């Protein structure tokens, strides 16, 4: 299979679907887990935060290692480790502490497959198609999350969270096998660094790169907080209309899966638009719409569920739409020898912020009692504030004279 071809990209995207089904396992079953594991909202958010922090550390380490030994090699090791840890999590996560430890270890394994996958796409897909290719790659992530949420919605009412965990853990095993088959013959590229070239000059003093990283950091705060708590919020909306908790959790997972489907569509569409219109205009449009949704969404508890779901679909579309463009942009404003290092810093900042978001969100819920529209409203506002900072970062990027490469279209309209 020719690296960079349509068939190669399709296969690596499908492997992404399976690999990331386990990513949302905890959030999808959270309403049931809070009761079964006797967790407060703060404790529940703590598990999500530890996952994101471990994921950030893994992304940083694996990205830096990829610069030195090649992205292909690190990607393959990450897929194998992810399959093993997914199976262990599904089999042995049965209370707060086992869930915390195993979910954190799972995050360390999954981190080996994300930025290394981004690097593989950047290395093998021509620049004129890179935006849409990155969009399709990240769309595989969203499809995996949607599939996992749908499976969880079926499983929790039939076999509880253990059955849900077992079903979604099959994804990294199948996805890992597909990834191994596709990527094993892809060249392992190691770009040597020119003498005198240093990280500080290539990244830290690179204004467009740092503004992209700043935008991505607060985008991640908003997105990962939203992903962590939207299934529970939708479950609360169903419970508020009279559903039992288990049924509400299942319905919430179903509806959250649709949110991720719109995110998948956004990734693909935004990638195409970014190639045609330029990276910055599409980032600004998506970030602005997502911020508005964050500021409104939580206050809808108690309104008709159809209204909540409708806005949730728009929210899911906008919140993820700019993600592949940030990933593409950072590879275009940093010299190839330092792409991994730049992605490492981006990942540490973004997923570090994403680790804080669920914990702060849960703390706000506890502060306001956890059940009212006021509690959910202010919790989602905390995500909207981060989204607003992302918008400001993109506006500053649009005014940077050395960021012109991100303004122009890559293909003819």
Region spans (language model):
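Juxtamembrane intracellular "pre-TM" segments in multi-pass secondary transporters
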Residues: 1-2, 186-214
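Helix-loop-helix hairpin linking two adjacent transmembrane segments in secondary transporters
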Residues: 137-181
């Amino acid at each position: 299979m020719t690296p960079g071809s349509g068939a190669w990209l399709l296969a690596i995207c499908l492997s992404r679907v399976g690999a990331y089904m386990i990513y949302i396992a905890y959030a999808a079953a959270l309403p049931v887990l809070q009761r079964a594991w006797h967790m407060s909202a703060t404790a529940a958010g703590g598990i999500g935060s530890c996952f994101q922090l471990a994921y950030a550390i893994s992304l940083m380490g694996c990205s830096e290692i990829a610069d030195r030994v090649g992205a292909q090699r690190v990607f393959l090791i990450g897929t194998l480790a992810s399959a093993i840890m997914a199976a262990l999590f599904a089999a042995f996560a049965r209370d707060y502490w086992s869930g915390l430890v195993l979910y954190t270890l799972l995050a360390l394994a999954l981190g080996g497959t994300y930025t290394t996958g981004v690097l593989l796409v950047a290395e093998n897909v021509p620049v004129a198609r890179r935006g849409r290719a990155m969009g399709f790659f990240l769309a595989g992530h969203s499809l995996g999350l949607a599939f996992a949420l749908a499976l969880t919605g079926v499983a929790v009412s039939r076999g509880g969270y253990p059955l849900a965990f077992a079903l979604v853990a099959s994804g990294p095993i199948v996805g890992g096998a597909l990834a191994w088959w596709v990527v094993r013959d892809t060249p392992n590229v190691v770009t040597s660094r020119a003498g005198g070239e240093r990280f500080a000059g290539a990244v830290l003093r690179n204004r467009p790169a740092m503004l992209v990283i700043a935008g991505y950091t607060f985008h991640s705060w908003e997105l990962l907080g939203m992903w962590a708590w939207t299934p529970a919020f939708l479950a609360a909306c169903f419970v508020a209309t009279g559903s039992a908790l288990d049924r509400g959790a299942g319905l919430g997972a179903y509806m959250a899966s649709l949110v991720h489907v719109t995110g998948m569509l956004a990734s693909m569409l935004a990638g195409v638009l970014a190639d045609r219109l330029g990276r910055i205009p599409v980032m600004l449009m998506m970030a602005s719409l997502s911020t508005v949704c964050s500021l409104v969404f939580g206050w809808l508890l108690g309104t008709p569920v159809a209204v909540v779901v409708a806005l949730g679909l728009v929210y899911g579309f906008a919140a993820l739409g700019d993600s592949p463009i940030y990933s593409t942009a950072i590879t275009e404003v940093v010299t190839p020898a330092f792409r991994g290092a730049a992605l490492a810093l981006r990942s540490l900042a973004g997923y570090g912020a994403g680790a804080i978001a669920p914990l702060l969100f849960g703390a706000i819920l506890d502060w306001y009692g956890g059940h009212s529209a006021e509690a959910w409203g202010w919790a989602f506002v905390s995500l909207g504030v981060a989204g607003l900072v992302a918008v400001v970062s993109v506006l500053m990027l649009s005014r940077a004279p050395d960021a012109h490469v991100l303004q122009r279209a890559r293909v003819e309209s």
